[in-house]
Amino acid sequence: LAGHVDSYFAVLVRVGLAALVFLPFLRTRGNSLKTVGLYMLVGAMQLGVMYMLSFRAYLYLTVSELLLFTVLTPLYITLIYDIMSKRRLRWGYAFSALLAVIGAGIIRYDQVTDHFWTGLLLVQLSNITFAIGMVGYKRLMETRPMPQHNAFAWFYLGAFLVAVIAWFLLGNAQKMPQTTLQWGILVFLGVVASGIGYFMWNYGATQVDAGTLGIMNNMHVPAGLLVNLAIWHQQPHWPTFITGALVILASLWVHRKWVAPRSSQTADDRRRDCALSE
C-alpha cells in the first residue's frame, strides 16, 4: 500500500473497520465521561497517531529498516509504565527489555538506506505513542476497569476520530485504492489485524507485568519473519534469526526467573517497612 494508497486514508479505513467490529459493544451506562475520554485517548495514541507515523515512515524505509527501528519499544514500555505508576524506575525491567532489543536487533540488522534519520525519527515517535497507548490502557484497566470489549469500543472510537481529522486535513483524494487486492488488504488489516489482533494483544497486556509486555512486543520480529516465510516463501537469514530469537526468549526467562520475583519482593519489603514506621 505504501506509495500507492494515501497513508491517511489507509489509516482511516483500518481503524474505521476495527471500530465497526466493536461498535455493538459501545456502552455509556456506569462509566464517567472522564473514564470514557481516557479510553478514547489511549486508542487515539496507540492506533490513530501511531498508524499515521508508521505509514509515513514506510515512504522512507525498507521493511527491514522499519522492523529494526521498532526494537526499542520494550524499553519505552517499561519506563513509561513506571512513570505512569509513579514508582521508582525498575532498572531490572529495563535490563531484561534491553536483552529483547538486542535479540530483535540481531535478527533485523541490515544495511540502512539514505533516509536513516527521517525514518528513525518517525518510527521512534511511533514507538513512543504506541507505548503510551498500550501502557495507558493497562493502567486504566488497573485503576478504572470496565469489560474489555466495552473498553475497546471507546478505544477504537478515539483512534477513528484522529484518523478522520487527519484525512480531512492531510489526505490526498487522488491516491485512493485502485485494485481489489488493495481493498482486500485494507479490509484484512482493519477487521483481523486491528479489530481482533489489537484486542487480543491489549487483553494479554492486562494479564502480565510491564517487563513481560515489553519483551513480548519484540516477538513480532521473529513471528513476522515466519509469517513472511509461510506466505511469501522469503527465507530469513537463519543463523541470525535463530540467535536473535534465542536471545529474546532468554530475556523473557531472565525476567520471569530473576527480575520480576526480585522486584516483587522489593516492593513487599518497602510496604512492610512503611507499615512498621507508621
Model-derived features with residue positions:
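Membrane-interface helix-cap regions at the ends of transmembrane helices
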Residues: 17-34, 101-115, 158-182, 225-236, ...
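Specific alpha-helical transmembrane segments that line the substrate/conduction pathway
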Residues: 9-20, 55-88, 93-94, 126, ...
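C-terminal-most transmembrane helix of multi-pass membrane proteins
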Residues: 11-16, 218-278
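Specific transmembrane alpha-helical segments of multi-pass solute transporters/efflux pumps
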Residues: 23-70, 106, 190-208
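Helix-helix packing/entry segments at the starts of transmembrane helices
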Residues: 12-13, 66-72, 137-160, 191-230
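Transmembrane alpha-helical segments that form core, pore/gating elements
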Residues: 18-22, 77-78, 112-171, 186, ...
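Transmembrane alpha-helices of multi-pass small-molecule transport proteins
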Residues: 3-49, 76-77, 129-136, 153-170, ...
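Loop-to-transmembrane alpha-helix entry segments
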Residues: 33-38, 67-70, 83-106, 113-120, ...
